[in-house]
Amino acid sequence: MTAEVRAQFGDYPDGRDDPHFISRTVILDKDDRVFLNADHLSNEGHLTVELLDEQFRPLKGFSGQDSAVLKESGLRQPVLWHDRGQLKGFEKPVRIRVNWAGQDSRNVRVHAVYVSPQ
């Protein structure tokens, strides 16, 4: 299933102690991957991406210290968890959480999150 989840904002969400957004639920097919369209990413301002279950609970191996980290800007930047791009073995819908991170994260813009096989 190809799905597109667009952020409700492109800029850093001011006024939040933990700047992030969470997608609606997404049903993943065995060959699906997550991609981000984002800019102004760097070592000092980057994004982390986590997977949550339907009840917003972090999924082991895809959240916290296992979160994917994006430090390069681009239109279809692949999100990789421990060098794994394909999201196999998910029988239930998931949510995608994108977090702003780093001392210069206020400059980072997120335009879209894509879920597709390629």
Regions found by a protein language model. Give the residues of each.
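Extracellular carbohydrate recognition and processing domains
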Residues: 58-90
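Catalytic cores of secreted or luminal carbohydrate-active enzymes
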Residues: 1-21, 46
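Extended extracellular/luminal ectodomain segments enriched in beta-structured repeat modules
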Residues: 28-35, 91-93
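Beta-strand-rich binding/interaction modules
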Residues: 33-37, 44-57
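Short beta-strand-to-coil "C-cap" segments at the C-terminal boundary of structured domains/repeats
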Residues: 1-3, 112-118
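Short beta-strand-plus-loop segments that form exposed binding edges in beta-rich domains
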Residues: 97-104
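Edge beta-strands of jelly-roll/beta-sandwich modules across compartments, strongly enriched
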Residues: 104-114
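Intrinsic-disorder/low-complexity, polar/charged segments enriched in Ser/Thr/Lys/Arg/Asp/Glu/Gln
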Residues: 18-23, 31-35, 76-78
